[in-house]
């Protein structure tokens, strides 16, 4: 087991990227001793990738990318828009020369149909994932799908659901992206999802049950790390905690 330890930009800045805020996050991640910075891509994709890449290198950081689909790219309602946006994110990730794009890539956060997920929606989801997975192979990028809790999505709320849809698509570059905050709500175990995923698990958001300091909430860290040890996890462990001390964070999340 040899994971890479990183942090999300959200540990220091709100989700909307600006050159000044981005550089601040890079500087803070480096000063804190992290090896990697997760860049949450803005839906506009408007930032200068070569400059950001140079700044990361100057501060000794690796990088990875994430994208959360906005409401206007909810796959069951707007599959073409979602497909285009994910491809744009893959292009931006390629400019940064990263090999991983994760996040909420199954639905717009907070969008609900008022009904249970349908077979038609499941088929649509698999079709979109298949298309973007094939597109991602051109730049050697693995896509990670993050399940989130039932209060924010009805499409993928557990590791089991994501793994089932990945199996249907059968693309080697689709993987599971876990988040311990959401796991605390939806999973009955922090160990079993890790074991079930095995080598399909590439990335984990490490965050407490209250989004606060690790170890001060309800997340069963011993169970999680026991599973990671058993599968010989070599992916990314990324801190994602939110703080009201970050200007604009409370309004953004």
Give names to the regions the model predicted.
Residues 62, 142, 234:
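Conserved H-loop
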Residues 71-77, 109-116, 151-152, 185-186, ...:
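A short acidic, helix-capping loop that chelates divalent metal ions and anchors anionic groups
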Residues 1-98, 171:
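N-terminal pre-domain/capping segments
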């Amino acid at each position: 087991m040899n994971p890479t330890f990183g942090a999300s930009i959200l540990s220091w800045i709100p989700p909307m990227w600006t050159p000044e805020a981005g550089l601040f996050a890079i500087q803070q991640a480096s000063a804190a001793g992290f090896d990697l910075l997760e860049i949450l891509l803005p839906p506009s994709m408007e930032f200068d990738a070569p400059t950001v890449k140079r700044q990361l290198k100057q501060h000794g950081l690796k990088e990875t990318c994430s994208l959360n689909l906005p409401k206007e790219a909810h796959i069951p309602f707007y599959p073409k828009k979602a497909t285009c946006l994910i491809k744009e994110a893959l292009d931006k990730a390629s400019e940064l020369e990263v090999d991983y794009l994760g996040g909420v890539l199954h639905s717009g956060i907070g969008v609900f149909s008022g009904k249970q997920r349908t077979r038609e929606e499941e088929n649509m989801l698999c079709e979109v994932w298949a298309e973007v997975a094939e597109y991602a192979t051109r730049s050697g990028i693995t896509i990670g799908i993050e399940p989130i809790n039932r209060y924010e999505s009805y499409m993928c709320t557990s590791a089991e659901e994501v793994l089932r849809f990945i199996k249907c698509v059968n693309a080697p570059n689709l993987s599971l992206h876990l988040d311990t905050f959401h796991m605390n709500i939806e999973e009955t175990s922090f160990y079993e999802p890790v074991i079930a995923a095995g080598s399909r698990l590439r990335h984990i958001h490490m965050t407490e049950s209250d989004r606060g300091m690790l170890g001060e909430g309800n997340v069963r860290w011993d169970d999680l790390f026991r599973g990671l040890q058993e599968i010989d996890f070599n992916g990314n462990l990324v801190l994602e905690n939110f703080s009201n001390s970050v200007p604009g964070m409370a309004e953004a999340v």
